Amino acid sequence: MNSIHGHYHIQLSNYSAGENLQSATLTEGVIGAHRVKVETALSHSNLQKKLSATIKHNQSGRSMLDRKLTSDGKANQRSSFTFSMIMYRMIHFVLSTRVPAVRESVANYGGNINFKFAQTKGAFLHKIIKHSDTASGVCEALCAHWIRSHAQGQSLFDQLYVGGRKGKFQIDTLYSIKQLQIDGCKADVDQDEVTLDWFKKNGISERMIERHCLLRPVDVTGTTESEGLDQLLNAILDTHGIGYGYKKIHLSGQMSAHAIAAYVNEKSGVTFFDPNFGEFHFSDKEKFRKWFTNSFWDNSMYHYPLGVGQRFRVLTFDSKEV
Protein backbone atom coordinates (compact mmCIF):
# COMPACT_ATOMS: atom_id res chain seq x y z
CA MET A 1 0.00 0.00 0.00
CA ASN A 2 1.42 3.37 -0.95
CA SER A 3 0.24 6.54 0.71
CA ILE A 4 1.34 10.13 0.43
CA HIS A 5 0.14 12.68 2.98
CA GLY A 6 1.59 16.13 3.60
CA HIS A 7 5.30 16.02 2.93
CA TYR A 8 6.08 12.38 3.69
CA HIS A 9 5.85 9.23 1.63
CA ILE A 10 5.30 5.91 3.31
CA GLN A 11 5.20 2.43 1.89
CA LEU A 12 3.62 -0.22 4.08
CA SER A 13 3.62 -3.89 3.18
CA ASN A 14 3.05 -7.35 4.62
CA TYR A 15 0.58 -6.16 7.20
CA SER A 16 -2.58 -8.09 8.05
CA ALA A 17 -4.97 -7.51 10.90
CA GLY A 18 -7.18 -9.97 12.78
CA GLU A 19 -7.54 -11.95 15.95
CA ASN A 20 -4.78 -14.37 14.90
CA LEU A 21 -2.31 -11.65 13.91
CA GLN A 22 1.17 -12.92 14.72
CA SER A 23 3.49 -10.43 13.04
CA ALA A 24 3.70 -7.00 11.53
CA THR A 25 6.27 -5.72 9.10
CA LEU A 26 6.92 -2.08 8.35
CA THR A 27 8.99 -1.46 5.26
CA GLU A 28 10.55 1.53 3.69
CA GLY A 29 9.55 4.51 5.75
CA VAL A 30 11.32 7.15 3.72
CA ILE A 31 12.39 10.61 4.75
CA GLY A 32 14.99 12.35 2.67
CA ALA A 33 17.42 9.72 1.49
CA HIS A 34 17.29 7.98 4.82
CA ARG A 35 15.44 4.72 4.39
CA VAL A 36 14.17 3.52 7.73
CA LYS A 37 13.46 -0.18 7.65
CA VAL A 38 11.87 -1.69 10.71
CA GLU A 39 10.96 -5.37 10.66
CA THR A 40 9.34 -6.64 13.81
CA ALA A 41 7.99 -10.05 14.67
CA LEU A 42 5.69 -9.81 17.65
CA SER A 43 3.62 -12.30 19.56
CA HIS A 44 -0.14 -11.76 19.55
CA SER A 45 -0.18 -10.50 23.14
CA ASN A 46 2.82 -8.18 22.72
CA LEU A 47 1.40 -6.69 19.53
CA GLN A 48 -1.92 -6.03 21.23
CA LYS A 49 -0.16 -4.23 24.07
CA LYS A 50 1.91 -2.06 21.74
CA LEU A 51 -1.02 -1.12 19.52
CA SER A 52 -3.22 -0.42 22.53
CA ALA A 53 -0.56 1.85 24.01
CA THR A 54 -0.21 3.73 20.73
CA ILE A 55 -3.96 4.18 20.35
CA LYS A 56 -4.22 5.41 23.94
CA HIS A 57 -1.36 7.87 23.37
CA ASN A 58 -3.11 9.31 20.34
CA GLN A 59 -6.57 9.52 21.84
CA SER A 60 -6.13 10.57 25.44
CA GLY A 61 -3.95 12.53 27.79
CA ARG A 62 -3.82 16.12 28.99
CA SER A 63 -5.24 18.41 26.31
CA MET A 64 -2.86 21.37 26.83
CA LEU A 65 -5.50 23.62 25.26
CA ASP A 66 -6.57 26.92 26.76
CA ARG A 67 -10.19 25.82 26.27
CA LYS A 68 -12.02 22.81 24.83
CA LEU A 69 -13.84 24.62 22.01
CA THR A 70 -12.89 27.42 19.64
CA SER A 71 -14.48 30.83 20.12
CA ASP A 72 -17.19 29.82 17.64
CA GLY A 73 -17.84 26.44 19.29
CA LYS A 74 -15.71 24.05 17.20
CA ALA A 75 -13.85 21.13 18.76
CA ASN A 76 -10.20 20.32 18.08
CA GLN A 77 -10.11 18.07 15.00
CA ARG A 78 -9.31 14.38 15.34
CA SER A 79 -10.01 11.24 13.35
CA SER A 80 -10.03 7.52 13.99
CA PHE A 81 -6.71 5.88 14.76
CA THR A 82 -4.88 4.57 11.71
CA PHE A 83 -1.82 2.37 11.53
CA SER A 84 -0.03 5.03 9.45
CA MET A 85 0.11 7.25 12.54
CA ILE A 86 2.72 4.89 13.97
CA MET A 87 4.83 5.22 10.84
CA TYR A 88 4.49 9.01 10.82
CA ARG A 89 5.73 9.11 14.40
CA MET A 90 8.84 7.18 13.31
CA ILE A 91 9.47 9.55 10.41
CA HIS A 92 8.96 12.61 12.60
CA PHE A 93 11.50 11.15 14.99
CA VAL A 94 14.10 10.81 12.23
CA LEU A 95 13.56 14.43 11.21
CA SER A 96 13.70 15.64 14.80
CA THR A 97 17.25 14.31 15.14
CA ARG A 98 18.38 17.05 12.72
CA VAL A 99 17.03 19.91 14.86
CA PRO A 100 20.16 20.47 17.01
CA ALA A 101 22.55 20.61 14.04
CA VAL A 102 20.38 23.09 12.13
CA ARG A 103 19.84 25.41 15.09
CA GLU A 104 23.46 25.31 16.24
CA SER A 105 24.62 26.36 12.76
CA VAL A 106 22.61 29.60 12.71
CA ALA A 107 24.93 31.59 14.99
CA ASN A 108 27.98 30.40 13.06
CA TYR A 109 26.73 32.39 10.05
CA GLY A 110 25.72 35.51 11.93
CA GLY A 111 22.06 34.62 12.39
CA ASN A 112 19.72 34.57 15.38
CA ILE A 113 17.05 32.13 16.50
CA ASN A 114 13.79 34.05 16.96
CA PHE A 115 11.72 31.07 18.11
CA LYS A 116 12.44 27.37 18.55
CA PHE A 117 9.65 25.38 16.96
CA ALA A 118 9.43 21.89 15.43
CA GLN A 119 6.29 20.14 14.22
CA THR A 120 8.21 16.86 14.43
CA LYS A 121 8.20 16.53 18.20
CA GLY A 122 6.65 17.55 21.49
CA ALA A 123 3.19 18.84 22.23
CA PHE A 124 2.54 20.19 18.72
CA LEU A 125 3.19 16.79 17.15
CA HIS A 126 0.84 15.27 19.73
CA LYS A 127 -1.91 17.57 18.44
CA ILE A 128 -1.45 17.01 14.70
CA ILE A 129 -0.88 13.25 14.93
CA LYS A 130 -4.51 12.80 16.01
CA HIS A 131 -5.94 13.43 12.53
CA SER A 132 -5.11 11.36 9.46
CA ASP A 133 -4.79 14.45 7.22
CA THR A 134 -2.41 16.27 9.58
CA ALA A 135 -0.43 13.36 11.03
CA SER A 136 2.28 13.60 8.37
CA GLY A 137 2.82 17.30 9.00
CA VAL A 138 1.15 20.67 8.43
CA CYS A 139 4.01 22.56 6.80
CA GLU A 140 1.86 24.25 4.13
CA ALA A 141 -0.67 25.54 6.65
CA LEU A 142 2.01 26.61 9.13
CA CYS A 143 3.83 28.63 6.45
CA ALA A 144 0.59 30.34 5.41
CA HIS A 145 -0.22 31.28 9.00
CA TRP A 146 3.34 32.44 9.60
CA ILE A 147 3.20 34.78 6.59
CA ARG A 148 -0.15 36.22 7.71
CA SER A 149 1.03 36.77 11.28
CA HIS A 150 4.29 38.40 10.21
CA ALA A 151 2.47 40.67 7.75
CA GLN A 152 0.22 41.81 10.59
CA GLY A 153 3.26 42.72 12.67
CA GLN A 154 2.61 39.82 15.01
CA SER A 155 4.21 36.49 15.84
CA LEU A 156 2.64 33.18 14.90
CA PHE A 157 3.93 31.79 18.17
CA ASP A 158 2.21 34.48 20.24
CA GLN A 159 -0.99 33.46 18.46
CA LEU A 160 -0.38 29.72 18.77
CA TYR A 161 0.66 29.59 22.43
CA VAL A 162 -0.93 31.23 25.45
CA GLY A 163 1.40 34.05 26.43
CA GLY A 164 3.66 33.24 23.48
CA ARG A 165 5.40 30.51 25.46
CA LYS A 166 5.23 26.77 24.86
CA GLY A 167 2.74 25.15 27.17
CA LYS A 168 -0.91 25.78 26.46
CA PHE A 169 -2.20 26.16 22.91
CA GLN A 170 -4.61 28.82 21.72
CA ILE A 171 -7.23 26.51 20.28
CA ASP A 172 -8.46 29.02 17.67
CA THR A 173 -5.03 29.20 16.02
CA LEU A 174 -4.34 25.47 16.34
CA TYR A 175 -7.74 24.69 14.82
CA SER A 176 -7.16 27.13 11.95
CA ILE A 177 -3.78 25.61 11.08
CA LYS A 178 -5.10 22.06 11.12
CA GLN A 179 -8.24 22.95 9.16
CA LEU A 180 -6.29 24.65 6.36
CA GLN A 181 -4.16 21.52 5.98
CA ILE A 182 -7.23 19.26 6.09
CA ASP A 183 -9.00 21.36 3.45
CA GLY A 184 -5.96 21.13 1.18
CA CYS A 185 -5.84 17.34 1.48
CA LYS A 186 -9.39 16.72 0.29
CA ALA A 187 -9.91 14.66 -2.85
CA ASP A 188 -10.01 16.57 -6.15
CA VAL A 189 -8.64 19.71 -4.48
CA ASP A 190 -5.51 21.68 -5.42
CA GLN A 191 -3.77 22.51 -2.14
CA ASP A 192 -2.06 25.56 -3.67
CA GLU A 193 -5.43 26.99 -4.69
CA VAL A 194 -6.86 26.33 -1.23
CA THR A 195 -3.97 28.26 0.32
CA LEU A 196 -4.31 31.10 -2.20
CA ASP A 197 -8.00 31.47 -1.36
CA TRP A 198 -7.14 31.54 2.34
CA PHE A 199 -4.49 34.19 1.71
CA LYS A 200 -6.96 36.41 -0.15
CA LYS A 201 -9.39 36.24 2.76
CA ASN A 202 -6.57 37.32 5.07
CA GLY A 203 -5.20 40.29 3.13
CA ILE A 204 -2.33 38.48 1.37
CA SER A 205 -2.06 38.59 -2.42
CA GLU A 206 0.25 37.18 -5.06
CA ARG A 207 2.81 39.68 -6.30
CA MET A 208 2.12 40.57 -9.92
CA ILE A 209 4.73 41.80 -12.40
CA GLU A 210 4.34 42.78 -16.02
CA ARG A 211 5.46 40.28 -18.62
CA HIS A 212 4.70 40.66 -22.31
CA CYS A 213 2.24 43.47 -21.55
CA LEU A 214 0.35 41.28 -19.08
CA LEU A 215 0.39 41.19 -15.29
CA ARG A 216 1.40 37.74 -14.08
CA PRO A 217 2.11 36.30 -10.62
CA VAL A 218 5.74 35.84 -9.60
CA ASP A 219 6.07 32.07 -9.77
CA VAL A 220 9.60 30.69 -10.18
CA THR A 221 10.28 26.98 -10.64
CA GLY A 222 13.51 25.08 -11.13
CA THR A 223 15.70 22.21 -10.03
CA THR A 224 18.26 21.86 -7.28
CA GLU A 225 19.65 18.41 -8.03
CA SER A 226 21.39 19.34 -11.30
CA GLU A 227 21.65 23.13 -11.10
CA GLY A 228 22.59 23.58 -7.44
CA LEU A 229 21.10 26.12 -5.06
CA ASP A 230 21.86 29.39 -6.86
CA GLN A 231 18.60 29.44 -8.82
CA LEU A 232 16.56 28.63 -5.72
CA LEU A 233 18.27 31.25 -3.58
CA ASN A 234 18.03 33.90 -6.30
CA ALA A 235 14.27 33.30 -6.42
CA ILE A 236 13.98 33.52 -2.62
CA LEU A 237 16.07 36.69 -2.29
CA ASP A 238 14.74 38.62 -5.30
CA THR A 239 12.46 41.48 -4.21
CA HIS A 240 11.81 42.64 -7.80
CA GLY A 241 12.87 46.21 -7.15
CA ILE A 242 10.24 46.73 -4.44
CA GLY A 243 12.58 46.12 -1.54
CA TYR A 244 10.69 43.40 0.31
CA GLY A 245 8.50 40.36 -0.20
CA TYR A 246 7.02 37.26 1.39
CA LYS A 247 8.09 33.91 -0.04
CA LYS A 248 6.34 30.56 0.14
CA ILE A 249 8.80 27.93 -0.99
CA HIS A 250 7.93 24.39 -2.07
CA LEU A 251 10.67 21.74 -2.15
CA SER A 252 10.10 18.31 -3.64
CA GLY A 253 11.89 15.13 -4.64
CA GLN A 254 11.16 11.59 -5.68
CA MET A 255 9.06 10.70 -2.66
CA SER A 256 8.59 13.80 -0.51
CA ALA A 257 7.60 17.46 -0.51
CA HIS A 258 7.92 20.24 2.04
CA ALA A 259 7.04 23.92 2.47
CA ILE A 260 9.13 26.68 4.06
CA ALA A 261 8.69 30.47 4.13
CA ALA A 262 10.65 33.71 4.34
CA TYR A 263 10.30 37.47 4.57
CA VAL A 264 13.03 39.24 2.61
CA ASN A 265 13.76 42.92 3.19
CA GLU A 266 16.64 44.72 1.50
CA LYS A 267 17.23 46.84 4.63
CA SER A 268 16.55 44.49 7.53
CA GLY A 269 17.61 41.15 6.05
CA VAL A 270 15.92 37.74 5.92
CA THR A 271 13.52 36.17 8.40
CA PHE A 272 13.23 32.46 7.62
CA PHE A 273 10.69 29.94 8.87
CA ASP A 274 10.89 26.17 8.58
CA PRO A 275 8.11 24.24 10.37
CA ASN A 276 10.66 21.53 11.19
CA PHE A 277 13.22 23.82 12.84
CA GLY A 278 11.82 27.22 13.81
CA GLU A 279 12.17 30.91 12.92
CA PHE A 280 15.61 32.41 12.23
CA HIS A 281 16.80 35.89 11.26
CA PHE A 282 19.84 37.03 9.27
CA SER A 283 20.69 40.73 9.11
CA ASP A 284 21.56 40.63 5.42
CA LYS A 285 20.90 38.44 2.41
CA GLU A 286 24.50 37.31 1.95
CA LYS A 287 24.67 35.80 5.45
CA PHE A 288 21.47 33.90 4.76
CA ARG A 289 22.73 32.68 1.38
CA LYS A 290 25.96 31.33 2.89
CA TRP A 291 24.12 29.61 5.75
CA PHE A 292 21.52 28.05 3.46
CA THR A 293 24.15 26.82 0.98
CA ASN A 294 26.98 25.74 3.27
CA SER A 295 25.06 24.43 6.27
CA PHE A 296 21.27 24.28 6.24
CA TRP A 297 20.77 22.33 3.01
CA ASP A 298 22.85 19.39 4.19
CA ASN A 299 22.07 19.52 7.91
CA SER A 300 18.32 19.45 7.23
CA MET A 301 18.71 16.40 4.93
CA TYR A 302 16.80 18.32 2.25
CA HIS A 303 19.60 17.81 -0.28
CA TYR A 304 18.78 14.18 -0.96
CA PRO A 305 16.92 13.52 -4.27
CA LEU A 306 14.79 10.84 -2.58
CA GLY A 307 13.65 13.51 -0.15
CA VAL A 308 13.02 17.08 -1.29
CA GLY A 309 16.29 17.78 -3.11
CA GLN A 310 15.15 17.82 -6.74
CA ARG A 311 12.71 20.63 -7.54
CA PHE A 312 11.51 23.93 -6.14
CA ARG A 313 8.76 26.46 -6.61
CA VAL A 314 8.94 29.95 -5.10
CA LEU A 315 5.85 32.16 -4.89
CA THR A 316 6.06 35.83 -3.85
CA PHE A 317 3.32 37.57 -1.87
CA ASP A 318 2.44 41.08 -0.74
CA SER A 319 0.30 42.32 2.11
CA LYS A 320 -1.59 45.54 2.61
CA GLU A 321 -0.20 45.67 6.16
CA VAL A 322 3.42 45.94 4.97
UniProtKB/Swiss-Prot annotation:
InterPro entries (UniProt xref): Papain-like_cys_pep_sf, Peptidase_C58, Peptidase_C58_Yopt
Keyword presence, Secreted: yes
Enzyme class, first EC level, given as a word: hydrolase
Any GO molecular function: cysteine-type endopeptidase activity
Main location per the UniProt record: secreted
One Pfam family in the UniProt entry: Peptidase_C58
CC annotations in GO: extracellular region
EC number: 3.4.22.-
Entry-linked SUPFAM superfamilies: Cysteine proteinases (SSF54001)
Organism: Yersinia pseudotuberculosis serotype I (strain IP32953)
UniProt family annotation: Belongs to the peptidase C58 family.
Self-association state and partner proteins as the record states: Interacts with human ARHA.
Biological role stated in the UniProt entry: Cysteine protease, which is translocated into infected cells and plays a central role in pathogenesis by cleaving the C-terminus end of the human small GTPase RhoA/ARHA, a regulator of cytoskeleton. Once cleaved, ARHA loses its lipid modification, and is released from the cell membrane, leading to the subsequent disruption of actin cytoskeleton of the host cell.
A GO biological-process term: proteolysis
Compartments where found: Secreted
Active site: residue positions: C139, H258, D274
Name of this chain's protein: Cysteine protease YopT
Keyword Cell division assigned: no
Keywords (A to Z) from UniProt: Hydrolase, Plasmid, Protease, Secreted, Thiol protease, Virulence
